Amino acid sequence: MEKLNLSNSMKLYKEAQDYVPGAVLGIRRPYNFVEGEYPIFFENGQGGRVTDVDGNEYIDMLCAYGPIIIGHREKEIDDVVVEQIRNKGFCFSLTQPHQNELAEVLRQMIPCAEQSIFMTTGSDATTAAVRIARASTKRNKILRCGYHGWHDWCVEVHGGIPAKMYEDVHEFHYNDLEGFEALMKQHGDDVAAVIVTPVGHPLAEPMQHPKPGFLQGLRDATTKNGTVLIFDEIRSGFRVHLGGAQVPFGVTPDLSVFGKAMANGYPISAVVGKKSVMKVAEKEVFISSTFFPNSLAYVAALKT
């Protein structure tokens, strides 16, 4: 096999090391790869293919790590975004009608989505869901299973985070119902939420499907304990099923978080859930960002 010419990528990589720590952020940092073969700087994409700065073409099997569910530069989606920019504007930092339209669409598709809160990233959504659960239950502890983002309470790499941050967060293994039940027995009176990826995808490990009874076992235990069950559907949402993995698996959580494939690459995420739990976000829980009410992401999501 002929070795790829990556000379332009390597030149940009050398420059980037001066501008950006490690040149590239995230789990795809250069030290995880073969020297001289990575990082590759991409210049454009169309449909299911992307091209780097050296002209090499690739099939985007990762779909940009999840968001590009339909294809790069999908004309129908990009057209509604351009129309919004040209004719209406998009950064108002105030509520726009598209919020209601999108919330109604999610309500029709997702079993638990009685109400919705829209944000930007998956980490925004998982962190907001945990905060809502703690406020709703007046409890502190979180039982988690899977990758839930880079924020302090859940990140896999602990550099720069005080150890006490993890005192109220305990991890159990996917499909290990017995181990989960032991944690619930130990911490039950103070467990605010159980957050789990309904399709198992631990960081850098193979994906897993739930064993019979696993998700229902979580549902039964959390209901009995008055604990909020959260499905992290950032990856599975709109991919396993339009309504998330909760539809084919037949287990309805109290809250769910969605993102990635929601708007074909435009940055948006959501916490959706039952009104009885979400109501604390009216006054008691503060969730805010200048860029959360973004009409470009709204119209892209609606078109997607």
Regions flagged by a language model, labelled:
Residues 2-304:
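Conserved N-terminal phosphate-binding loop of PLP-dependent enzymes in the Aspartate aminotransferase
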